[in-house]
């Protein structure tokens, strides 16, 4: 398991310090910087992952491909690439911003709060997956249209950040562009 921190933010999104990642996520989680990424394969299918049961927040929940926290001195794009390698063992194309101003707060059934400024990215995989079981307990390659129908019909079956991202009209449009074969 990687030791990481989160970059704390004030209400205007300005960095104010750091805190160890595990300690940062509590019932009173402070606002911090994160990222979320949606990955597509060469067939235009979306990678949906199920969070490992050892995760502190939303264990066992289906979500978009990979999420994480940039480290000090690291761009969001560099953080996406790092976490894709760590969680999924996969190489990707340069991440593209699809929802740059996404911000949310949500509480999981155990009372753990996510409180994040969380730019959203999409990319294509360029290598085979090598799943890290400490991070991901299951995964599926799915047609984006099927996933979006599932989110619309049963939002409770997915992470709240995935649902909020997928219900944003502009983000949906940008995600749909990744289903086109290149």
From Swiss-Prot:
Cofactor: Mg(2+); Mn(2+)
MF GO annotations: isopentenyl-diphosphate delta-isomerase activity; metal ion binding
GO-annotated cellular components: cytoplasm
Compartments where located: Cytoplasm
Keyword Metal-binding annotated: yes
Domain Nudix hydrolase: 30-164
Segments passing through the bilayer: none
Family the UniProt entry places it in: Belongs to the IPP isomerase type 1 family.
This protein's name: Isopentenyl-diphosphate Delta-isomerase
The organism of origin for this protein: Escherichia coli O6:H1 (strain CFT073 / ATCC 700928 / UPEC)
């Amino acid at each position: 398991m990687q030791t990481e921190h989160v970059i704390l933010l004030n209400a205007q999104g300005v960095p104010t310090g750091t805190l160890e990642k595990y300690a940062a996520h509590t019932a009173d989680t402070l606002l911090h910087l994160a990222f979320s990424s949606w990955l597509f394969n060469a067939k235009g299918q979306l990678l949906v992952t199920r969070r490992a049961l050892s995760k502190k927040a939303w264990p066992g929940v289906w979500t978009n491909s990979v999420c994480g926290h940039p480290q000090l001195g690291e761009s969001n794009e560099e953080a996406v690439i790092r976490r894709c390698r760590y969680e999924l063992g996969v190489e990707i194309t340069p991440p593209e911003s699809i929802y740059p101003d996404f911000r949310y707060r949500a509480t999981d059934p155990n009372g753990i709060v996510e409180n994040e400024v969380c730019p959203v990215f999409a990319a294509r995989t360029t290598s085979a997956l090598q799943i890290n079981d400490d991070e991901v307990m299951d995964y599926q390659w799915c047609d984006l249209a099927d996933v979006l129908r599932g989110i619309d019909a049963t939002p409770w079956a997915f992470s709240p950040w995935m649902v909020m991202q997928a219900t944003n009209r502009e983000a949906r449009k940008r995600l749909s562009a990744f289903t086109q074969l290149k």
